[in-house]
Amino acid sequence: MLDISIAIDGPAGAGKSTIAKIIGNKLNIMYINTGSMYRAVTLMALKNNIEPYDIESLKALINSMNISFNGNNIIVNGKDLEEDIRMPIINNNVSKYAAVEEVRELLVSMQQNISKKYNVVMDGRDIGTVVLKDAPYKFFITASAEVRAKRRLKELKEKGININFRDVLKEIKERDYIDSNRKVNPLKQSKDAILIDTSNFTIEEVVDKICTIIKKD
């Protein structure tokens, strides 16, 4: 399979990362979770006490980060940060850092450079509208806020993180608002993206649907 790029966008907790990961494995192409990149920046910024408004420090921080992927895990400066970037404190802060124009510009540039070298499936908030505008396959994965909150709660409890449904739902709705209303590259469905509501479908059913569409071509 040559010169293929697949863009998968959607709100927090819609299942897009899990779906994109499986598709990458099925089609034997590189999977890039762009959300992990924003989470890694958020983690490093919090560790270094860098606020979202401290633009120059954020730019210097990102430029000092050597980002790569080992399978599905994000590696920064040689360290696997996959577990650290899934902590609730990152969930609560990532949208603030991801809304910073300079942060998005630097990470989008990294993502586009990767797509020029490899066949990729990328998931995020602005893949079909910004990062891979010319991707031949674009999908917008969504689900109701309540369904997404239940999924996120299950994930967190499986990791031993104790949190209640009301707090998770509140966080999901807050992230939806920030992601959809930020000035730079807000979350929105690309006009040529196929909308898939996963509320009443299993991950396997959604993956099969997407793979069928791709293989038709």
Curated annotation (Swiss-Prot):
Designated name of the protein: Cytidylate kinase
Enzyme Commission identifier(s): 2.7.4.25
GO terms, biological process: nucleobase-containing small molecule interconversion; pyrimidine nucleotide metabolic process
Protein origin, superkingdom: Bacteria
NCBIfam families named in the record: cmk (TIGR00017)
Catalysed reactions, semicolon-separated: CMP + ATP = CDP + ADP; dCMP + ATP = dCDP + ADP
Keyword terms, alphabetized: ATP-binding, Cytoplasm, Kinase, Nucleotide-binding, Transferase
Upper lineage: Bacteria, Bacillati, Bacillota, Clostridia, Eubacteriales
GO molecular function, one term: (d)CMP kinase activity
Record-linked Pfam families: Cytidylate_kin
Protein family (similarity comment): Belongs to the cytidylate kinase family. Type 1 subfamily.
Location within or outside the cell: Cytoplasm
Cellular component GO terms held in the UniProt record: cytosol
Gene3D superfamilies cross-referenced by the UniProt entry: P-loop containing nucleotide triphosphate hydrolases
EC main group: transferase
PANTHER family: CYTIDYLATE KINASE, CYTIDYLATE KINASE/PANTOATE-BETA-ALANINE LIGASE
Ligand binding (ATP): 10-18
Broad class of where this protein is predominantly found: cytoplasm
